[in-house]
């Protein structure tokens, strides 16, 4: 019989957000950063297209747009970092509190699981001892009966 050891993972645990969910949340916090990134990428694509067509003036204009969009994206990123910097420390404290609470919950579940398994083991040991006791009594009775039957045969 295979017995699984108790896991330190809680069963009702919510999953950590994946990369796309994290990106979506950060994009909602700082919407100008992804917008600037998209505009920069668009400017580079337009510059590449105009370069392929041989339109030098449009190519230069699109590369200048790219520089402007990159600057705006960088300003939005730094500004958002300063703005959300204090809020981030508050979020960090809240997250640490949640992690501590989750660790306490896991420890509690772990202890409950170990106690449950220990009670099962103790019950099995008790049943084993009772079975051994019954077998000894049956063996003793059988031995006594055999002895009595041997004594009767000898008489």
Curated annotation (Swiss-Prot):
The entry's protein name is Respiratory supercomplex factor 1, mitochondrial
Q: Which PANTHER family match?
A: HIG1 DOMAIN FAMILY MEMBER 1A (PTHR12297:SF3), HYPOXIA-INDUCBILE GENE 1 HIG1 -RELATED (PTHR12297)
Q: Which domain of life is it from?
A: Eukaryota
Q: Domain (HIG1): give its ranges.
A: 4-95
Instruction: Quote the subunit structure annotation.
Output: Associates with the respiratory chain complex III/complex IV supercomplex.
Q: Which UniProt keywords apply?
A: Coiled coil, Membrane, Mitochondrion, Transmembrane, Transmembrane helix
Question: Which stretches are transmembrane?
Answer: 32-49, 62-84
Where in this chain does the entry annotate a coiled-coil region? Answer: 111-142
Q: What does this protein do?
A: Cytochrome c oxidase subunit which plays a role in assembly of respiratory supercomplexes.
Q: How does it sit in the membrane?
A: Multi-pass membrane protein
- The organism is Candida dubliniensis (strain CD36 / ATCC MYA-646 / CBS 7987 / NCPF 3949 / NRRL Y-17841)
